[in-house]
Regions:
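Substrate-binding cleft of extracellular glycoside hydrolase catalytic domains
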Residues: 111-217, 228
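Substrate-binding cleft of secreted/luminal carbohydrate-active enzymes
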Residues: 67-78, 282-347
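Acidic (Asp/Glu)-rich catalytic clusters
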Residues: 64-65, 88-97, 113-127, 178-185, ...
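Aromatic- and acid-rich polysaccharide-binding/catalytic face
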Residues: 244-265, 309-311
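Alpha-helical scaffolding within the catalytic cores
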Residues: 57-59, 83-91, 112-116, 173-177, ...
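Sec-dependent N-terminal signal peptides of Gram-positive bacterial secreted proteins and lipoproteins
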Residues: 2-24
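Aromatic-lined carbohydrate-recognition surfaces of secreted/lumenal glycan-active proteins
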Residues: 74-76, 191-193, 215-242, 281-292
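N-terminal module-boundary/linker segments of secreted carbohydrate-active enzymes
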Residues: 30-105, 295-297, 345
Length: 347
């Protein structure tokens, strides 16, 4: 059974204040002015983990209230450009603003470094999202995502087999890292097995049925065995498929649904496709993009993505017009780091 979070959405202006609540979830300290709401006036959303932490509830509640009223800015980091602040310094230099969400990656077994940067971003008041590029042994880099493949999906997904034990041992690497963030009361938008339907990463090469089993195994392992109550589960489609329903494991394993695309514009057709799967039960995010859609494009396309996250390095520095970037980050519809509620306040 899912934990209920109510989001009562206003028609024109959504005010987040210390006294405002979403169900039993405190919304925020800072008032944020947003524009016309295209969502329903009252929507019931649910957290999949019945025992989710207070911090996860608060973050999820904020995202639910934002959905349909504004878009949260996000940026994926790189760590090989001379500074782990490369993209963030660039955005601030060009716009005077920082993104609200920092995207991180446990790739190359960088659990310690990612956790340190996640904790720092959280202390700055930001939102943390983590993905995991890895091979089928849950180690390595982006290349291993593409080049490796499970030898026998049936054995790997059958409890008690040596292959299953190996799968679980690999999966547990990130669980241990996420426990360290849990100890610090840091909620995480956890985005595993992204671009799940694309066919290029090992986790999608076994087909939809095997993928769904894999997702459920991780969800159960992390939620029920490791008691990771700080995770908000983000289910991320690619933009290259329209047969989305067959990959969907069920509402009880997902908190936020989304897709990515490196095509210009609001990608409203992609949004509509994902919206059908969401069926009004959860927010929808643009979990990766190249060129950020303008606010005009989002409004005209009625694409109510709750956040965007630009990919790293040249995707932000070369792929986005500086004037557009400045306009986007300074538009009242776009939430930046300085406009987030105080998620780090003493509970």
């Amino acid at each position: 059974m899912k934990k209920k979070v109510m989001a009562a959405l206003s028609a024109v202006v959504l005010a987040f204040s210390a006294s405002a609540c979403i169900g039993n979830v405190s919304a925020a300290d800072k008032t944020v002015q947003t524009v016309e709401n295209t969502a329903k006036e009252e929507v019931s959303y649910s957290l999949s983990n019945q025992d989710a932490s207070k911090e996860a509830e608060e973050l999820y509640g904020y995202i639910c209230e934002t959905f349909g009223n504004a878009i949260i800015s996000g940026q994926q980091e790189s760590t090989w450009m001379g500074s782990d602040q490369y993209e963030f310094d660039y955005i601030y230099k060009k716009t005077g603003k920082y993104p609200a969400i920092r995207g991180l990656d446990y790739m190359n077994d960088d659990f310690k470094g990612v956790n340190e940067r996640a904790a720092d971003w959280h202390k700055r008041g930001g939102i943390v999202t983590i993905c995991w590029h890895c091979g089928c042994d849950f180690s390595g880099s982006w290349d291993e995502c593409m080049k490796t493949e499970l030898d026998d999906w049936d054995k790997a997904l059958t409890e008690g087999t040596p292959e299953y034990k190996k799968l679980i041992a690999g999966m547990d690497k990130a669980a241990e890292a996420l426990k360290e963030l849990k100890k610090q009361n840091i909620p995480v938008l956890w985005r595993p097995f992204h671009e799940l339907d694309g066919g290029w990463f090992w986790w999608s090469k076994g087909g939809a049925e095997n993928f769904k089993k894999l997702w459920i195994i991780m969800y159960d392992r992390y939620t029920n065995h490791h008691k990771l109550d700080n995770l908000i589960w983000v289910f991320g489609y690619s933009g290259n498929n329209r047969d989305y329903d067959k990959w969907y494991p069920g509402d009880e394993y997902i908190d936020i649904i989304g897709a990515d695309s490196y095509s210009d514009g609001a990608n409203e057709k992609l949004y509509r496709s994902v919206e059908k799967i969401a069926d009004g039960k959860m927010p929808i995010c643009f979990h990766e993009c190249g060129r950020i859609p303008t606010v005009k494009q989002l409004k005209e396309g009625k694409a109510d993505w709750v956040w965007f996250m630009t990919w790293h390095t040249e995707y932000i520095t070369d792929g986005n017009n500086v004037d557009d970037l400045k306009n986007i980050y300074n538009d009242e519809y776009v939430i930046t780091l300085d406009e987030l509620p105080n998620f780090t306040k003493t509970k």
